């Protein structure tokens, strides 16, 4: 099975990382509209926005509590997950990232040209 199928057939995704560079597992889970529990470390809070249940790292009790909370009110958390997918589409696509990178380069060049060197 591929990763998309595994996420899509899951009721909850749990990303309990102690550190994430970019956080592909978070983006993958959100892209598949799976209610997400993730640690509030590294880049994860920035990636998830308000579309995940964030917990402290190394807190297995929080994982249990968050899982029960999601499964007890699944429709609510599924709706959040659906909105989370839209968040990923709007904020983490190559066209947007490339444009932002391009703008940063242009602004840097402009600042350098305008500098009194």
Where are these regions (language model features)?
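A short, well-ordered alpha-helix in the C-terminal region of glycosyltransferases
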Residues: 69, 76-91, 97-103
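Short acidic alpha-helix that forms the nucleotide-activated donor recognition element
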Residues: 1-10, 31, 45
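Short hydrophobic beta-strand element within catalytic cores of glycosyltransferases
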Residues: 26, 35-38
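C-terminal alpha-helical cap of glycosyltransferases
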Residues: 94-117
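Acidic donor-binding loop of glycosyltransferase active sites
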Residues: 8-21, 34-35
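Conserved acidic donor-binding loop of glycosyltransferase catalytic domains
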Residues: 17, 38-40, 46, 55-56, ...
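Conserved acidic donor-binding segment of nucleotide-sugar-dependent glycosyltransferases
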Residues: 53-60, 69-74
